[in-house]
């Protein structure tokens, strides 16, 4: 199962994590050493991007402190998912949050799990989104369009 989240929201979340770990690594050498030792190199001063096909070219000249960097990363990651989606169950993050009970039922069915007695418990884990939309003006609109098209393709192929 692969959750697919709105690309700008997802990229903004990744950027927040990167900035969070930049601050933690600068403040506490133990955190940086610990994250290195356990192989968490996704964010902060230790950041090493996963080598998705075409990512190096996409990230050339991009700053990891920018939303565009993480949008490029999102596109490369989910292009890889799209190319290998056979056997994957794609699930819209937003649909899980807005209609947890229905989506939980569909997910359990897709996973061939008899969860009829636990459906309410399972669906309770998916909290509705706050009604407020966030604005992210600091990104390339054409990059957003590319990411949105991929997002729609993936969500359409999902449950």
Model-predicted segments: where are they?
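PAPS-dependent sulfotransferases, especially Golgi type II membrane carbohydrate sulfotransferases
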Residues: 19, 23-159
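Conserved phosphate-donor/acceptor-positioning beta-strand/loop module used by diverse small-molecule
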Residues: 1-17
